[in-house]
């Protein structure tokens, strides 16, 4: 795959893991399209980081839970405009709570962004990549989708759903030379984990053999590998980036 002529689309890319993924893919030669619903200032910072390393990037505001907005975005900015080589479904939110107290809207909203939004992007990317007869789709799942996590019934369900979607889509698209894989991060230093108390962090570390939280760059490098030619014979897999936490 000639990366200098190829575009990688990363959702939820203005900060955290998504921003690190965009940075790595730009480093590897892709033109990167970043989407998110975060503030414009965060978009500007993400673009600046990429351009300062000599990369090419554009930022777009996109709520992936709005299926029509996703379809419109692909029609306006992707289809017949660029060679879409990579899609990274990273957009995600949390609305934690114990199951007996969880509100319907909190369950539905997390699935709308984390699972249905990923599906909407995957579907549009698959149409384009199938015609190209090449492409890489990488879904960001989570250790919570593999092992479950108390207080995250909605989040865990969505991330487990991403794994099932990954494996099914991989079987459907393999004949078109499109690979579909997932990356399942463990506990990573991001805005989502920054709010954890020291007591909670210490409890998590007890279950991580490497005795540290991961960095966004650890996940980004795994994504960059799956997006590369080195991973051309890998599809339908879940790459765990979790410091040794095993299901």
For each feature predicted by the language model, list its residue ranges.
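Conserved glycine-rich cofactor-binding loop
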Residues: 14-15
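Conserved glycine-rich Rossmann-like NAD(P)H-binding loop of the short-chain dehydrogenase/reductase
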Residues: 30-45
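C-terminal substrate-recognition "lid" of short-chain dehydrogenase/reductases
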Residues: 122, 130, 134, 212-241, ...
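Alpha-helical segment proximal to the catalytic Tyr-Lys
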Residues: 127, 171-175, 232
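Residue(s) in the substrate-gating loop at a strand-loop-helix junction
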Residues: 142
């Amino acid at each position: 795959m000639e990366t200098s002529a190829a575009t990688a689309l990363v959702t939820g890319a203005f900060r955290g893991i998504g921003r690190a993924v965009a940075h790595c893919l730009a480093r590897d030669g892709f033109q990167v399209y970043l989407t998110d619903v975060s503030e414009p200032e965060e978009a500007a910072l993400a673009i600046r980081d990429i351009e300062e390393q000599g990369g090419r990037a554009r930022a777009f505001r996109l709520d992936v839970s709005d299926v029509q907005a996703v379809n419109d975005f692909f029609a306006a900015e992707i289809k017949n405009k660029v060679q879409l080589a990579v899609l990274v479904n990273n957009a995600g939110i949390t609305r934690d709570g114990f199951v007996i107290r969880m509100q319907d809207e909190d369950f539905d909203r997390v699935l709308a962004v984390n699972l249905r939004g990923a599906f909407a992007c995957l579907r549009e990317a698959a149409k384009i990549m199938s015609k190209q007869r090449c492409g890489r789709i990488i879904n960001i799942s989570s250790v919570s989708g593999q092992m479950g996590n108390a207080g995250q019934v909605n989040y865990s369900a969505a991330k487990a759903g991403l794994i099932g979607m990954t494996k099914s889509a991989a079987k459907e698209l393999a004949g078109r030379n499109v690979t579909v894989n997932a990356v399942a991060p463990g506990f990573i230093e991001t805005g989502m984990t920054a709010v954890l108390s020291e007591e909670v962090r210490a409890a998590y570390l007890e279950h991580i053999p490497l005795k540290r939280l991961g960095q966004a760059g650890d996940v980004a490098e795994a994504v960059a590998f799956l997006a590369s030619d080195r991973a051309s014979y890998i599809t339908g897999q879940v790459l765990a980036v979790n410091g040794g936490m095993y299901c």
